[in-house]
Amino acid sequence: MGLSSLPLVFLLAAAPPLGAASVPPIALPMSLEAFETVLQEGDISQLSAACADADRFGLQERLRLLRDRLMLVAPSPQPFAVVMANARALLACKAPDSTQIVLSRYGPGPGLQRREWLLLSWQAASAALDQDRAVLALRRLADGDLTRLDTELLIVGQSVDGLPLTRSALDLLANHELAAGRPEEAVTVLLAGRTPGVVASRRLGQVAELLAPLDPERSDLLLEAALDQ
């Protein structure tokens, strides 16, 4: 070895160790200056993004200010798309009750708009634990035919991988009825299901549990009425 080997030694010393991972940048909330600009001048989409940022970092005062701003940014009347964007932004701001207020500014007719409106109304009611309003939204979505809800999959959360978690709207309606203190209505809803196999077995097991405390005669009448439908 001689002087000619020194550059190689220096290069090896300077190289990062094998397998060393780069340190990810530290996530920080929106700066105060940027937040104030969005609060005063931002549109609905910018306010919604600010809500998500404030919620991520637990900044409750920012959430409060953003909620107040979202209630004023698009005064009635507004077209359907604006009302829905405003309502979704309030939901992102953890204000489900205010979401319902904004939704009440627009009454959609039959069709896709009504479906979208009802689904967002259900989402807000579910977030607010407003069981009666959640029941109303799903029953209106069913439009008199509970079997429609059997194959209607609604997003109820996210997996650890960030993938959407879904549940049948029929099962969700039964849960809302049960949470509202109406087990007999929950039984009727569950028996409206048409999905066979494991799902049917699970629902029948739940029905059996709900019927157990009831008088046998009342239980039989309820089963007959549900099956007749």
Predicted segments — roles?
Residues 2-15:
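Bacterial N-terminal signal peptides
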Residues 18-229:
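Alpha-helical solenoid repeat scaffolds
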